A protein has these predicted regions:
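Conserved nucleotide-cofactor-binding alpha/beta core module
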Residues: 2, 85-205
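Class I SAM-dependent transferase core
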Residues: 2-93, 101-104, 109, 122-124, ...
Length: 228
């Protein structure tokens, strides 16, 4: 299947809704990598959505998880994932486990994933969901990783699922040469998804992928503010 070949419409309501999520939301938002599109058909998003919002599992919106956090919209998840070009030899760090759905997607592509969340409830529920999905190449940690997490590093890929007003340099230092990092940087209402790449010489370059606005990581590094 190439990037422009549409999938056939499934017969069941559940699979039909998943199909339309991929074809109408995700593919139309410049996500054309067939590996990513196929992955989003195979990994069951509804199994990671809080039961109160399960009917909205395929909706083009963020879903509340509690504790001020959200499950990102499907197209945002897909666009971030596509930009990282994850290989099956990559080690991945995820900051903000949340529902565990992005964790599952990352683990389906990479060799190993370390996912950290400051909320113990999220770590516990994600562990149950990942186990039910048969995903075993994930290490879940509970802790404050908003300003860095060196344990198990360095990494080939780092994903921040919450925004940061300023991207701490510690994350860049935790990247292997050739490593990629994606984060939403800025403060509401102006935030941008940025892809950071570390060169073989150790320098980092960043490109802006798209504009969005998502909740901040708890205890995120704040910019210096002038006082008058």
């Amino acid at each position: 299947m190439n990037a422009t070949t549409p999938l056939s419409v499934p017969s069941s309501d559940l699979e039909r809704n998943r199909f339309f999520m991929v074809e109408q939301q995700i593919r139309t938002w410049e996500v054309l990598d067939p590996v990513i599109l196929d992955l989003l058909m195979r990994v069951h998003r509804e199994d990671f959505v809080p039961s109160a919002h399960r009917a909205l599992a395929f909706a083009d919106m963020e879903l509340p998880l509690g504790h001020g956090e959200v499950m990102l919209s499907p197209k945002t998840e897909a666009r971030m994932l596509q930009s990282l070009m994850i290989k099956n030899t990559d080690s991945v760090l995820e900051i903000g486990t949340g529902s565990g759905f992005i964790t599952a997607l990352l683990a389906s592509l990479a060799r190993q994933v370390c996912s950290v969340d400051i909320v113990p409830e999220f770590t516990r529920s994600a562990a149950a969901h990942l186990s039910a999905a048969g995903i075993k190449n994930v290490t879940l940690e509970t802790g404050d990783a908003a300003r860095g997490w060196d344990k198990h590093g360095p990494y080939d890929v780092i994903v921040l699922t919450g925004s940061v007003p300023v991207l701490p340099e510690s994350f860049q230092h935790s990247l292997n040469p050739g490593g990629r990092l994606i984060a939403v940087v800025g403060e509401a209402p102006v935030m941008q998804a940025q892809l950071v790449t570390r060169t073989s010489g150790g320098a980092c370059s960043a490109v802006t992928l798209f504009e969005t606005c998502i909740p901040s990581l708890k205890n995120a590094l704040q910019p210096q503010r002038f006082k008058f």
